[in-house]
Amino acid sequence: GPPMTYEDDDLDDAAAIDAAAEPPREPLYLSVYDFVDDWLLPNYQRKPGPFRWDPNWFDNFEAVERLTALWYAFEAARHDAAPAMAAFWLNTLDPMMRELSSQEGVFWYVRLYGEAGSATSPEPFKSNRAPDAIRTA
């Protein structure tokens, strides 16, 4: 027989059924600030020492971007099956927090654990312009 095809109306109907079957997912936290204060910091604790953390993390652009990504991943994982939260911890939270709090990480400028630092950025990595011959290849 002829190959099966889908009409636009069929796709619209399928999308409407999917939308009706699953109500919109409400986030547990309404902002990255709430997520960090109410979930992340109470649940992710480390012994002071080699770790860096700026209590004014919200003044550091990269920290805000990374923590926002972490918050989005948390909100997605909490709606999935139970193993999703374990995967969130192992594959997302742990590596992200290591990057944020390592001595060479985002809060490199903080001298003592928990001491507010000056959220200045180091000079960005430099890049020489690649030759046009390889840029257009």
Regions found by a protein language model. Name each.
Residues 82-137:
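Amphipathic alpha-helical binding modules
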Residues 43-80:
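Amphipathic alpha-helical interaction modules
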Residues 8-53:
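Short terminal alpha-helical segments
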Residues 36-43, 73-77, 96, 100:
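Generic structural signal for hydrophobic core residues of well-folded globular domains
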Residues 23, 27, 31, 58-68, ...:
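Alpha-helix boundary/N-cap detector
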Residues 1-23, 126-137:
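Non-catalytic accessory regions used for complex assembly or targeting
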